[in-house]
Swiss-Prot record:
Probable core component of the endosomal sorting required for transport complex III (ESCRT-III) which is involved in multivesicular bodies (MVBs) formation and sorting of endosomal cargo proteins into MVBs. MVBs contain intraluminal vesicles (ILVs) that are generated by invagination and scission from the limiting membrane of the endosome and mostly are delivered to lysosomes enabling degradation of membrane proteins, such as stimulated growth factor receptors, lysosomal enzymes and lipids. The gene is chmp2b. Residues 178-203 are annotated as: Disordered. This is Charged multivesicular body protein 2b. Residues 189-199 have a biased composition (Polar residues). Its main location: cytoplasm. GO terms for cellular component: cytosol; late endosome membrane. Belongs to the SNF7 family. It is found in: Cytoplasm, Cytosol; Late endosome membrane. GO terms for biological process: protein transport; vacuolar transport. It comes from Xenopus tropicalis (Western clawed frog). It holds the Pfam family Snf7. It comes from the Eukaryota.
Length: 214
């Protein structure tokens, strides 16, 4: 019983109208089919009367045929009109659905705008930007400090590696030359032998410069 007194929605009304239009279209199609059948019968009667030489009967039947064909033409016009109405109904239904969707969206936007405070939102964004800049500055300072520490450590390690390399090379050369030097039991080497077996300061300095150590 509740459904009998329920208020019809726009969709319900449009659905009923489309149903009626479809019924009207089917009725027009049936009427046209009947007219076409009657048209063929009249044509056969006219031919029959013409063969019999009955001109008056042919004249009367011809007038009926003209009226019937006019009526059949009207059915096409009415059918076209019904189709147009059905199309318009569908367009209206689509437009009303779009309007309903826009109305719902507008209400949602209105509710959101009521909850939002533009001034407060702007202040929040400004605070975020300010704190973000502070964080970036702090991060940059920390990175610079760490870079300085590690760069200095790397420089010291690199310098020490170079010095060790030079000393190793010098040690290898000294060992090689001292292996050829005479032992203490055979007496001290002469001045010329000492000069040839040892490494001069100039040679050490030259090797250091070659490795980039000042």
């Amino acid at each position: 019983m509740a459904s009998l007194f329920k208020k019809k929605t726009v969709d319900d009304i449009i659905r009923e109208q489309n149903k009626e239009l479809r019924g009207t279209q089917r009725a027009i199609t049936r009427d046209r089919a009947a007219l076409e059948k009657q048209e063929k019968q009249l044509e056969m009667e006219i031919k029959k009367m013409a063969k019999a030489g009955n001109k008056d009967a042919c004249r009367v039947l011809a007038k009926q045929l003209v009226q019937l064909r006019k009526q059949k033409t009207r059915t096409y016009a009415v059918s076209s009109k019904v189709t147009s109405m059905s199309t318009q109904t569908k367009v209206m239904s689509s437009q009303m659905k779009m309007a309903g969707a826009m109305s719902t969206t507008a209400k949602t936007m209105q509710a959101v705008n009521k909850k939002m405070d533009p001034q407060k939102t702007l202040q929040t964004m400004q605070n975020f930007q300010k704190e973000n800049m502070k964080m970036e500055m702090t991060e940059e300072m920390i990175n610079d400090t760490l870079d300085d520490i590690f760069d200095a450590s790397d420089d010291e390690e690199e310098s020490q590696d170079i010095v060790n390399q030079v000393l190793d090379e010098i040690g290898i050369e000294i060992s090689g030359k001292m292996a050829k030097a005479p032992s203490a039991a055979k007496g001290l080497p002469s001045t010329s032998a000492s000069k040839s077996s040892g490494i001069s300061d100039e040679e050490i300095e030259r090797q250091l410069k070659a490795l980039g150590v000042d």
